Amino acid sequence: MADQLIIFDTTLRDGEQSPGASMNKDEKLRIARQLERLKVDVIEAGFAASSNGDFEAVQGIARAIKDSTICSLSRANDRDISRAAEALKGANRSRIHTFIATSALHMEKKLRMTPDQVFEQAKLAVRFARNLVADVEFSPEDAYRSDEDFLCRVIEAAINEGATTINVPDTVGYAIPELYGTFIKTLRERVPNSDKAIWSVHCHNDLGMAVANSLAGVKIGGARQVECTINGLGERAGNCSLEEVVMAVKTRRDYFGLDVDIETQHILAASRMVSQITGFVVQPNKAIVGANAFAHAAGIHQDGVLKARDTYEIMRAEDVGWSANKIVLSKVSGRNAFKQRLQDLGAQMESESDVNAAFARFKELADRKSEIFDEDILALVGSESVAREKEQYSFVSLSQHSETGERPQASIVFTADGKEVKSSSDGDGPVDASLKAIEAQVKSGAEMVLYSVNAISGSTESQGEVTVRLQHGGRVVNGVGADPDIIVASAKAYLSALSKLHSKADRVAAQG
């Protein structure tokens, strides 16, 4: 029988550390539910001690999710660990993930602690956490750049104190696959009690090798847990990509000899949801979930695939949630057909009221578009106006006038705390005029640091998905809006970003 590989998803914690990727607690819960549908083994729901908002998010996820272990990160101190345990009280299965840096650079420059002090603090932290929960994970931060002898001492002590998982981070993405795999193997051989814990890998993508390093840690090193994120989301160049690791292990089971429990047909819906909520667009050539992942342009390749799929395809697109049926619904489609299509796409809603709300928006869209594509459906149900807590600002209507040689004019109606607001402005273009009209009333003072438009499907009547990133007072937030009218989509995205900007709580920095 093959060994089991544990999938530990940290999209909601490490993934959220990407500048602009902050999520509110309702958005985190939606992603957590999708991760549960994927059958992710462990969901790191956040860093409970970092802010009241993160505490509430971890607490809400712990109470709602039944099939996955829910984990909270904590620094190696009693306050953080107690806060994590408190947030996790309602979970069916809970884990505290505590960490402290062990590299000479981090100990000296960041912690200003001696190795002996770090050693003692690591021991005490694991001991304290183990008295609160049965499942404790310990991470020596920046492990790959740590002194090997010292690292072995710390890990041995952590296991003696009750750590059930030892995670070995390549915090800055410095590792090379063969060397990292050998590093994990050496640690497991040198630590006397290594067989008492599950070994885990956590790799960053600074040199583009997070997935390769993680797989080497599994194959060469014998790790049996991989820490990863949907779409490889994470600070700097990102984290190990969940979808790539899972499909590599499943597709090359002959090589890895491992099983994973992930329900892969829900991968695309998870990717789309994370992209839509965070505003981080998936590149077209991204493995597994990119728009071109299963596309063949060369004539010889197309001919081969038509004759036999396995000539150029090593996976079936349907296995990760893609559908060969591009035009799926129209304005005459009923609610049952719509609900079935959601299920086919792995995009189930949380309740019947959410289905009704999504169906109403689908009918509105169908009145404006003759053909509704899978991508339209995923954008629609992933939009922030479905199944989320009420936003401070929401779009109502917009009109604009533009003629060659004249400055465009825009008039917009939106709600602010439930009250309708009307505003008009001119601008350098219709989008500029619309956003200036909003700003004239809101007066946020925020700086726009990103504006991007992505066509959801390939036709001229495609919905445009707009991402707006705002920065103010050290805060960076994303807003996303989708609509066949790019100007309307832009206004929706801007209002969404403003709502996040005004509700985001301050938080402290966490481990990489």
Swiss-Prot record:
- Sequence ranges assigned to domain Pyruvate carboxyltransferase in this UniProt record: 5-268
Protein's pathway: Amino-acid biosynthesis; L-leucine biosynthesis; L-leucine from 3-methyl-2-oxobutanoate: step 1/4
- GO cellular component term of the entry, any: cytosol
Which CDD domains does the record associate with it? DRE_TIM_IPMS (cd07940)
Compartments, record wording? Cytoplasm
Catalysis: reaction(s): 3-methyl-2-oxobutanoate + acetyl-CoA + H2O = (2S)-2-isopropylmalate + CoA + H(+)
**Gene3D superfamilies reported for this sequence:** 1.10.238.260, 3.30.160.270, Aldolase class I
Question: Where along this sequence does the record place binding of Mn(2+)?
Answer: D14, H202, H204, N239
* Keyword Nucleotide-binding tagged: no
What is the superkingdom listed in this entry's lineage? Answer: Bacteria
Q: Provide the primary localization.
A: cytoplasm
EC number(s) recorded for this UniProt protein: 2.3.3.13
Enumerate the GO terms in the molecular function aspect.
2-isopropylmalate synthase activity; acetyl-CoA C-acetyltransferase activity; manganese ion binding
Keyword tags? Amino-acid biosynthesis, Branched-chain amino acid biosynthesis, Cytoplasm, Leucine biosynthesis, Manganese, Metal-binding, Transferase
Looking up Pfam families in the UniProt record yields: HCS_D2 (PF22617), HMGL-like (PF00682), LeuA_dimer (PF08502)
Positions of the UniProt region annotated as Regulatory domain: 394-512
* InterPro entries assigned to the protein according to its UniProt record, in alphabetical order: 2-IPM_HCS-like, 2-isopropylmalate_synth_dimer, AIPM/Hcit_synth_CS, Aldolase_TIM, LeuA/HCS_post-cat, LeuA_allosteric_dom_sf, LeuA_bact_synth, PYR_CT
GO biological process annotation, one example: L-leucine biosynthetic process
Q: Which cofactor does it need?
A: Mn(2+)
Q: Do you know which HAMAP family this protein is assigned to?
A: LeuA_type1
The entry's function note states: Catalyzes the condensation of the acetyl group of acetyl-CoA with 3-methyl-2-oxobutanoate (2-ketoisovalerate) to form 3-carboxy-3-hydroxy-4-methylpentanoate (2-isopropylmalate).
Q: How does it assemble?
A: Homodimer.
What's this protein's family per the entry? Belongs to the alpha-IPM synthase/homocitrate synthase family. LeuA type 1 subfamily.
**What is the protein name for this chain?**
2-isopropylmalate synthase
